[in-house]
Amino acid sequence: SEAATPLIPVTLRVTLAAIMIFMITIGFLGNAIVCLIVYQKPAMRSAINLLLATLAFSDIMLSLLCMPFTAVTVATADWSFGSGFCRASIMLYWLFVLEGVSILLIISVDRFLIIVQRQDKLTPHRAKLLIAGSWVLSLCVSLPSVVGWRTGAAGMGAAWAPQCVLGYSDSLADRGYTVLLAVAVFFVPFAVMLYSYMCILNTVRRNTLRIHNHTSEHSCLPALNQVSKMRLTGLQRPPQIKVDMSFKTRAFTTILILFVGFSVCWLPHTVVSLLAVFSRRFYYSSVFYPVSIGALWLSYLKTVFNPVIYCWRIRKFREACQEFIPKSCRLCPRVPGRSRRRVRPSNIYVCSETQSAV
């Protein structure tokens, strides 16, 4: 059966397309700055920054190779780029989405190992190997969407969708592949990241209580007793603990914001993708078009979300942006080389009784 025409006025479609073009611009510029900062500053090429740059690169590719065609299709309510590119666009969309999710998953596991397990083993070399492996895995998972699948887009005789999507199918193989995509893109990463962040939160809470209790014990000692003790020769001063709790709280809050952003942006799209393949009634209904636009908007919003969060929450990123933006007119600005310094993030979360935490 043929799909119903989308009940969205032309003015609204053009407005949505214009906003999407604005999202493309912001997403491209913000993520490009992230990549260039890491590329041009040797001191910024730590393992975590290499991962963030890869995440930014996948968002750039999503902004350039997928979002413009979606904006045109939303404005014209017609897919004008041919059936061949329709299939290719599906593959590219899932490739860059899977790569971005893979990087988020690697970062989450790395934070878990550092803070909870006290194992800081992710070197820049290992990060590069993980990045290469994630690209290969993402390509292998997304490649089957190019062949043997019924696709749909606005004006192609199937469902009215704002971009090429995996359409309704009775095939068990097609449905199984859709479930695989949903599991790989959302459900497994969500479960792993949720577990990691809950463990991180529990660890930070325990360390906070330890610091609070330790400080209270020493603050309750009578002043006279402290004076008499200090007069004794060879007696060490009471250990002092200085922990930047505001930094710890802010760092974890930043991680939590990224996780919440991932969940909000991808849960609706995952549900819509599953319904489109399993429910013929939903796929060919008039509500599929506006619902698809909303889900796609949220998924594309992720390309804008990450650099905004970096600039808002990370002081070093803001400082690097301030250094870089005035030089952006130069093609190859010379940056003085800096010695590389291995940063141990686990030190931030270690309660030491002999030295202050970094």
Q: What is the predicted function of each stretch?
A:
Residues S1-L7, G157, L209-F252, R315-V358:
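Intrinsically disordered regulatory tails of 7TM GPCRs
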Residues S1-P6, V74, D78-W94, A127-L130, ...:
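Loop architecture of class A 7-transmembrane GPCRs
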Residues P9-I21, A47-I107, I114-P124:
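Extracellular TM2-ECL1-early TM3 structural module of rhodopsin-like
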Residues L12-Y39:
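First transmembrane helix
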Residues M20, M61-A77, I90, V97-L104, ...:
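Helix-to-loop junction signature of class
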Residues F22-T25, T54-F57, M61, P68, ...:
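Hydrophobic residues within alpha-helical transmembrane segments
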Residues I103-I115, G148-A154, L181-S216, T254-A276, ...:
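Class A (rhodopsin-like) GPCR signature focused on the TM5-ICL3 interface and adjacent 7TM helical core
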Residues G261-V264, T270-S273, I293-R344:
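Seventh transmembrane helix
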